[in-house]
Amino acid sequence: MSEKGRLFTSESVTEGHPDKICDAISDSVLDALLAADPRSRVAVETLVTTGQVHVVGEVTTSAKEAFADITNTVRARILEIGYDSSDKGFDGATCGVNIGIGAQSPDIAQGVDTAHEARVEGAADPLDSQGAGDQGLMFGYAINATPELMPLPIALAHRLSRRLTEVRKNGVLPYLRPDGKTQVTIAYEDNVPVRLDTVVISTQHAADIDLEKTLDPDIREKVLNTVLDDLAHETLDASTVRVLVNPTGKFVLGGPMGDAGLTGRKIIVDTYGGWARHGGGAFSGKDPSKVDRSAAYAMRWVAKNVVAAGLAERVEVQVAYAIGKAAPVGLFVETFGTETEDPVKIEKAIGEVFDLRPGAIIRDLNLLRPIYAPTAAYGHFGRTDVELPWEQLDKVDDLKRAI
């Protein structure tokens, strides 16, 4: 253990990071298709590099106009992020956009459209007719460390990234560019966050900016201090924090010109910042028939309601599926010794209150809607800036009654 205590670190990135551009494009294409045809089956992957965007994957949809307009959807999202000039290293209006999308495999579709329960076992329940789109395991987590019931390091890192984008877009720091990263290291004592140890903020900027005289003080005042004042965490001492702004020096060459980007390469940023486990599946570009996405959302919904109901101070839940089967093959609940009720009772109550078949998750969270583009940056969980159905605390009373 360090003399400074147990140190835990999480990172976030801005929407202009190359990987996040790809997540945003994939989810914008998904939303456009779902808006026109809620039953669209979508698995879209994006790659960006200098001057080019490649969008590939599998789509089955009746939304012919939206499908034909994918190129314009791609350009619009890039411009919205802020890449609108070659001076910034990328321009959504002039970059090359290559589309290579085919249809969903009929072998996969048969298991999703007619699950094993209906096809082989003769189940009559309509919710037994939709099978999982793949095998896999998904985790959800919640902890009472923040109002949004998220681990503090990732919650703070996301707030810093959102603030970086906010001061760029609203003109407070107009010399900032879209690409950026944040990292937060917090000291813990007995699982309580006690001290903000280190904050790293790296941001792309215009070429003529003086790092020491302008960028460093501006980031401290307009980004870090604003976020810390808003956070006002009761146990966290930030008085001795070490702040590193652009520790490599200048950061002019960024975005796709600085690094190639791919959909699904920021899965820890997307979830719990490494504080909780991850099943390995990415989210962006996937319609909710893919349990990688919908079941991970459902598990966050479960975990958040368990903590909000006072059944545990923190909880991690895992669910697992077999491709083509509706019912989960496994459910695991871990309360880390913080439970206020018997963990066996908590697991039983979860099974009674939440229907974790894919069709039921889609129904209960109303997932066949164009709600995914805002999740492509700043995390899918614990969001305070957008309303997401898996963040609702609508099962607290049901869990209490079930216990």
Swiss-Prot record:
It is an enzyme of class 2 (transferase). Keywords: ATP-binding, Cytoplasm, Isopeptide bond, Magnesium, Metal-binding, Nucleotide-binding, One-carbon metabolism, Potassium, Transferase, Ubl conjugation. Pathway: Amino-acid biosynthesis; S-adenosyl-L-methionine biosynthesis; S-adenosyl-L-methionine from L-methionine: step 1/1. One of its GO terms (molecular function) is methionine adenosyltransferase activity. Binds 2 divalent ions per subunit. Binds 1 potassium ion per subunit. Catalyzes the formation of S-adenosylmethionine (AdoMet) from methionine and ATP. The overall synthetic reaction is composed of two sequential steps, AdoMet formation and the subsequent tripolyphosphate hydrolysis which occurs prior to release of AdoMet from the enzyme. This is S-adenosylmethionine synthase. It comes from Mycobacterium tuberculosis (strain ATCC 25618 / H37Rv). The gene is metK.
